[in-house]
Amino acid sequence: MARRHVVRAAVSVAAAATSLIVAAPASAAPGVGSPGLGDPYFPLAGNGGYDVRHYSLDLDYVRATNHLDASAVITARATQDLRRFDLDLRGFTVSRVTVNLLPATFTREGQELVITPRVPLRRGKTFFVKVEYRGEPTEVIDPDGSSEGWVPTADGAFVVNEPQGSPGWFPANDNPRDKATYDMAITVPKGITAIGNGRLLSRRDHGGRTTWRWYEDSPMASYLTTATNGVFELRISKAGRIPLYHAVDPTEVPDGAFERLAAEAEVIKFFSDLYGQYPFSSGGGVVDHAPEVGYALESQTKSQYDSTPDPSTVVHEISHQWFGDSVSLTVWPDIWLNEGFATFSEWIYDEKHGGPTAQASFDQVYARPATNSIWTRPPGNVGGPQFLFTGTVYDRGAATLQALRVKVGDKTFFRILREWYAHNRDGNVTTADFVRLAERRSGQRLGAFFDTWLYQPAKPTTW
């Protein structure tokens, strides 16, 4: 994510990760899935007792009334015997729920949709949930005061979800640990373009409306989904064999939005050479006119820009496809694994393209006085969800990587980054995982180094 215009931050406590799988003894009666997964910042986000494999979303949106008529079919595997389980959903009127084609009873408890299937679910078995719902999608206000979820625009909606916006428009197991594949059918008035994740399968006009079908075949965290829609010019090109979908609001065309997005092909090649093969089967970006949002987001395969981005923002968001989207955090306090890596990627891109070296960028950060918040609020322990996206996770996070580069040498450092991606592609990680890899590949004990850079509320002086 590009830096927000409001204050935010992140705390990295790898030990706080709780298990997604909670298995009941074989002899026990079917249990109840937990209403949250215990994330240190968002303890009720996500749900226990099952693992989602696929979401099939059918969304029919009318901007004039800001009304969404929708259904979600969720394919999941039970990780314990279940007589009841939850999904995360904000607002809406839920009209019907079925589990394995049988009507299920359901209640609403805050943002929990509590479902009781007619027949209990057995551990290890695949099951299917269909939720039919309608109403006004939710624009979620974050702890830092910024907007996410389904944010209405003049002609549609800008749909971005980090960290907790997706339940504002579809029922989800809203925790980054439970990745799944997705297909979306987004129906909008004719003349409106709807952009989902992955590849465009079809576009069909019918009765004054248009249905856009998208499919993302790589596992994706729920916060990385999108269904942005509005009046856009859509252009399709390629980066090698990878289709790129670029959608731009007409008001942003004169500012060079298409030219900025066209750079994605070269950026993808650069990071593919540096880190490893591009993670996904498609790519692209959306430039909307949504100045009230105030940030860009690395939605998987379709970076979302609230206005025409500068070149460094494009580089930042594309690098997130490796670090953040494919290699994803396990708990939100480890957000520096996303933003620090993407900011360092900006630095190394500049270094290799005639700009400042990464060391020069490090020096600029390090020149900040000891009273600066990046030193007093370390990226591995920033104090709460309201600080998730403050400068420390970006700048001090990136500085941590550059300091590691100097400490272990270029050959070892870039081997660490390549292995980090290769070994964790489509998966979830913690800071502790990265420390172990860095120590193993460098042959050095790095606990004190990472403690100094990530967890101490003071400017590092020796490391």
Segment roles from a protein language model:
Residues 357, 390-463:
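Amphipathic alpha-helical substructures
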